[in-house]
């Protein structure tokens, strides 16, 4: 085989690897791999929210047989309120498509982007990306649960001090510089990261989350309560003082890999 043939084959393989690698990276970042984008970023608008125990963020369906909108990865920051009111901030353009309703003790915030509003220049496109930019919730002590069903929007809990709070989302979660007596992760997405802070009681439903990790140097957990059907975990050195396994069924199993002496208790 001639040297030029080897070179051509090498270039082809290299190009193919770069294409596949680029698509994989963009998938991991949660960003669309198409060029058409609806940009809703812009100046931030801050508004007060009514008193509630639960805040539920969601979106309307943005896909039909003709076209679909891919929400590019964004961040929902959850921080403490500086006053006695809950507040929410997002770009002015995003706010135009938000609908808020109160249902009992739950505030529902819906990103309602109708395909009727689809830009004319994208009418021929099968898929279009939407960039919403980051959003932020500032919570009072009365909020006990945050649910986020906005596609691929990561939740970052920062500098929160609360007696207890529950997080329910199919997206990634990060906990940074928080102090909780009890934190419950009802659902968690691709990555749940406990970066720093203090958590007395951590409740995790392993059936409804993928990977989770603890930075043992900066995040201090007293007791972990793990529930599920069949799961496997590695208990890091210094990760927590006690671990409880709460099986969902009689035949549920938990495989624990220990890196030091630890107390693991099965609760019936």
Where are these regions (language model features)?
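Intrinsically disordered, low-complexity terminal regions
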Residues: 1-168, 172-176, 185-186, 194-195, ...
């Amino acid at each position: 085989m001639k040297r030029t043939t080897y070179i051509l084959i090498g270039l082809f393989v290299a190009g193919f690897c770069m294409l596949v690698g680029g698509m994989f990276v963009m998938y991991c970042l949660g960003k669309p791999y198409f060029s058409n984008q609806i940009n809703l970023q812009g100046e931030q608008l801050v508004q007060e929210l009514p008193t509630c125990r639960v805040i539920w963020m969601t979106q309307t369906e943005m896909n039909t047989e003709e076209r679909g909108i891919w929400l590019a990865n964004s961040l929902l920051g959850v921080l403490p309120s500086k006053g006695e009111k809950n507040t929410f901030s997002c770009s002015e353009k995003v706010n135009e498509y938000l609908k808020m309703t109160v249902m009992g003790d739950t505030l529902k915030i819906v990103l309602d982007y109708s395909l009727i509003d689809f830009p004319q220049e994208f009418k021929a496109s099968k898929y279009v990306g939407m960039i919403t930019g980051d959003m932020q919730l500032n919570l009072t002590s009365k909020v006990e649960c945050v649910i986020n069903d906005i596609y691929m929007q990561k939740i970052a809990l920062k500098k929160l001090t609360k007696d207890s709070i529950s997080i329910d989302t199919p997206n990634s979660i990060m906990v940074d510089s928080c102090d909780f007596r009890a934190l419950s992760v009802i659902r968690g997405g691709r990555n749940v990261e406990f970066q720093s802070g203090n958590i007395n009681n951590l409740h995790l439903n392993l059936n409804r989350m993928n990977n989770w990790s603890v930075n043992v140097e900066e995040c201090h957990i007293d007791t972990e309560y793990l529930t599920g059907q069949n799961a496997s975990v590695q208990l890091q050195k210094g990760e927590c003082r006690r671990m409880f396994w709460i099986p969902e069924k009689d035949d549920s199993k938990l495989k624990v890999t220990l890196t030091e002496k630890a107390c693991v208790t099965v609760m019936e």
